[in-house]
Amino acid sequence: MTSRRRFLQTATAPLATLPFGSVFAQDGADALRKRFQIGIQEYTFHRWIKSGKLDHLDYPALAKDKLGIDHIEYWSRPFGDKNTDKAYVGELAKRSTGEGMTNVLILVDIGDQLDATDAAERLRSVEEHKGWIDCAAQLGCKAIRVNCRSGGDREENLKNMADGLGALCDYAKGSGVKAVIEPHGGNSQDPDWLLAAMKRLDHPNAGLLPDFNNFGDYDRYAAVEKTLPHAVAVCAKALNFKEDGTESNTDFARMLKIVHDSGYSGVVSIEFEGHDIDPIDGALKTKELIWKSLEAAAGVKG
């Protein structure tokens, strides 16, 4: 009969051949990849879509095959008017979720603003956004990104935002879809205004989409840290890279240390907007930088 001591010696023998700490480091790396998922935003390929080089329905396959990414974010413009076409959206769902991918959110850019000063415009905007809530629900997305960038007097803007976005959030109840504000012009670039918006709405279907590069004159690091508690996803925007692989505008190591230490868990999505290199190359560079930064923040090696 094998003694307990002999069993333990045999069972742990392979570990003795590994560098000290490597087993625990691997556990840490695996845990990091369970906590965070890398996503890709379709706007990364907006020039390809506009030129016809990339068809909207082929985008999920490109993300998986060329980038090794299976968490997908969409942009409203490539849908045209087909976001309410159940067959078309069903085909897109089949090409994504059918391949084991996860649809995350849709960036919705339409003319009428949810926080417009004109009540009739707000009402039109709510009605237009309802179709995007339905589209996101059919795709299995957890959110749509909305714009609240009419600006003007902060308090009046908050009131108008609560009227328009509040009505949309009420519509979204039970859909599994949130309507999230991105810093994208007007008062929405002010993190304190965004926090006031969340407090004013106080709605389970409302949230935020922090963006590394969209807070205007505000300190981007402090702004992201403030807004992370309401984040449904995080937008890791990259524009250009230095020779050492770091991003020219944002210190990714510093920013992703903030994301890591905040307790946030979920998708960190690439949005590459550079013009000097191919979007595939830009997305891959951003992906590498995200993981490298998160690993450094966690003190693990991938």
Give the residues covered by each predicted segment:
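Hydrophobic residues in well-ordered beta-strands that form the structural core
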Residues: 40, 103-105, 145, 181, ...
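A short helix->loop->beta-strand "cap" motif at the edges of active sites that frequently abuts
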Residues: 101, 177, 262-266
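N-terminal pre-domain/capping segments
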Residues: 2-138, 156, 173, 203, ...
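Active-site groove signature of glycoside hydrolases
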Residues: 136-154, 175, 180-184
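Acidic/histidine-rich catalytic cores of soluble enzymes
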Residues: 71-72, 162-258
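A structural motif
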Residues: 69, 136, 141, 231, ...
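Active-site cleft segment of glycoside hydrolase catalytic domains centered on the general acid/base Glu
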Residues: 151-165
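Conserved active-site loop/cleft motifs that coordinate metal ions or position small ligands
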Residues: 266-273
